Amino acid sequence: MKGICSDAILVLATSMWMAFAIDFPLPMASERGQLDKTIVECLKNVNKCWFLSYIKPSEPICGSDQVTYSSDCHLCSKILFEGLNITKLYDGQCENS
């Protein structure tokens, strides 16, 4: 019984750590070399996006193309898989959306 309890605590602690440690804020467009930094962050973290979609609510971000994306993961998929040269302008919806 003691082993089961300690296993449950370990699983809970790991789950909590993952819920808060996975977030990967993309660099804002005001930073120099932001597209290169954005691509690096996306490549490092895109494999975590499937997990993020289950545990965290989407938080919209505004891209440099003035399109509102549902999350950093959504913007990363557009950059990596569709080859768009866009960066994150700011958190929240774009003003024209």
UniProtKB/Swiss-Prot annotation:
Disulfide bonds: C42-C76, C49-C73, C62-C94
Sites marked Reactive bond: F51, L52
A Gene Ontology term for the protein's cellular component: extracellular region
Gene3D superfamilies: 3.30.60.30
Keywords from the UniProt entry: Disulfide bond, Glycoprotein, Protease inhibitor, Repeat, Secreted, Serine protease inhibitor, Signal
Domain Kazal-like: 36-96
Carbohydrate-modified residues: N85
Signal peptide location: 1-21
Major localization class: secreted
PROSITE patterns: KAZAL_2 (PS51465)
Record's subcellular location: Secreted
Molecular-function GO terms, alphabetical: serine-type endopeptidase inhibitor activity
Domain of life from the UniProt record: Eukaryota
InterPro entries xrefs: Kazal_dom, Kazal_dom_sf
Its biological purpose: Probable serine protease inhibitor.
Record-given protein name: Serine protease inhibitor Kazal-type 8
Originating species: Homo sapiens
